[in-house]
Amino acid sequence: MEERYDVTIIGGGPAGMFAAFYCGLHQLKAQLIEALPQLGGQPAALYPEKRVWDVAGKAGVTGQELADDLAAQIEVAPVDQFLGEKVTDVVKEDDGSFTIHSAKRTSTSKSIVIAMGNGAFSPRKLALPGAEELEGKQVRYFANHKEDFKDQRVAVLGGGDAAIDMALMLEDVAEQVYLVHRRDAFRALEHTVAQLEASTIEKLTPYLPKDLTVNADQSVTLNLKKMRADEERPLEVDKVLVNYGFTSNNAALKDWSLDLASERGQIKVDQTMKTSVPGVYAIGDGVVYEGKVALIATGFGEAPTAITNLAKELYPDKRMAIHSSSMGIG
């Protein structure tokens, strides 16, 4: 027999998890579906030990700590959770309800909240001969466990916030960290750059990796070419950590039987987080509206906005408390 829900949240990153918590507060029958085998989205999957600074009241929380805190918060007002389950289709029925299909089961829901971020993500690869064969060994795209780099020489490639954060995170465990960027200036927050300037990290700019070779002791020599010059220099390291950003793809949405208005691959929403399809809301990095800022903190504001407004639509005669202090928790 199909399960019937008031709300189905698709995506178990920070915004989706906070939305699930709010469903529990409003005593809505809700399910949270996540394609990965664990909750937490990109912070938990990509940088569990990296510190996140843009969450109010959580100064320097790691990606995994943030996911754990959100999971504990959901337990205050639990909802059904289905992990390792990819939604293959969402169909709007004639009565306005939705049928949600996955490879494992089928369920129905009165409303949908899409919290899938930018969809499946993959790192931009180091385009050098031999780099692919070294993936997971000398060449890495993630620093999930900084102890993997203990007492090693590490070259971090990239010049944005994420690259600098990775370099700073490894500074206290690595023997030496090098930051290689093709420009003289870094594209990062001023505070982050100030931390870099005060660190022991050796900045190599403006250089671009030209080739790499594996040495007899399994270290790697990166040959760096200076931009707009003939100068080259070798750099011998134990690990190369590439941080050129990620490509993302919400192709799964295109397979669903929902005609969602979008802009450059992101879902258009109004001030209540409604999409162009009645009964479907969207929150997080995968949505667009005027003035949108793609931060975890922004998603935390969008989640209660979406849940409170859809709750009013589902139960217009029910008085909806807005503040948790009015909901009898604790």
UniProtKB/Swiss-Prot annotation:
SUPFAM superfamilies given in the database record: FAD/NAD(P)-binding domain (SSF51905)
GO molecular function, one term: flavin adenine dinucleotide binding
Family: Belongs to the ferredoxin--NADP reductase type 2 family.
Enzyme Commission no: 1.18.1.2
InterPro entries registered for this protein in UniProt: FAD/NAD-bd_sf, FAD/NAD-binding_dom, Fd--NADP_Rdtase_type_2, Ferredoxin-NADP_redctase_2
Full protein name: Ferredoxin--NADP reductase
Complex formation: Homodimer.
Pfam family, one: Pyr_redox_2
Organism of origin: Limosilactobacillus fermentum (strain NBRC 3956 / LMG 18251)
